[in-house]
């Protein structure tokens, strides 16, 4: 039954795929593949509640099932929840980065996820820039620390963690480069 469900899914017959996969579940098959088929077919039919639940079941069986994370991202994207969609797309792409040897149907899904993730990140960056820019333009109140925080938030810079070689002083705050005026003897 599962093979027939996969064939129906590939033949763009999601209703048949869900029906056959659910029959396989009723017969005792309970693994990541059957729930993945149900998740993909339900998403393709627009039944986002069922797709979400099936993707959760697939992830419960295999926490590294990147395709189930893509389905969850698609569900949240369709439900206009960009924050959750971006998180699930990011997780999927970190579990299974795009590579040339990927099966074509999976590659298409991951390319879509990557494109949507980039679009969501760009929209978030534009939104934050639009909302925060007036505060940054106020030279009297905008400090380099505030500008650094905004750059971290927008992904323009990464947080630096020191990697001491000789001695570690645990109570020092983390600064990428300490300002020279803190050390007048240098």
Predicted regions and their residues:
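Canonical positions in the second alpha-helix
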Residues: 23-24, 57-58, 91-92
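Fe(II)/2-oxoglutarate oxygenase catalytic core
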Residues: 74-80, 84-186
């Amino acid at each position: 039954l599962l093979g027939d469900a996969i064939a129906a899914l590939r033949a763009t017959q999601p209703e048949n795929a869900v029906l056959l996969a659910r029959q396989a579940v009723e017969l005792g098959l309970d693994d990541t593949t059957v729930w993945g088929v149900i998740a993909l077919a339900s998403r393709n039919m627009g039944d986002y509640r069922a797709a979400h639940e099936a993707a959760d079941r697939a992830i419960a069986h295999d926490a590294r099932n990147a395709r189930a994370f893509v389905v969850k991202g698609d569900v949240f994207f369709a439900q206009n929840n960009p924050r959750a969609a971006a998180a699930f797309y990011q997780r999927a792409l970190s579990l299974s980065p795009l590579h040339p040897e990927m099966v074509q149907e999976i590659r298409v899904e991951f390319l879509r996820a990557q494109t949507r993730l980039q679009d969501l990140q760009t929209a978030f960056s534009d939104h934050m820039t639009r909302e925060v820019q007036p505060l940054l333009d106020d030279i009297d109140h905008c400090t380099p620390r505030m500008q650094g925080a905004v750059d971290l938030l927008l992904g323009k810079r990464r947080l630096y963690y020191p990697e001491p070689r000789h001695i570690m002083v645990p109570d020092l705050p983390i600064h990428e480069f300490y300002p020279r005026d803190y050390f007048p003897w240098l």
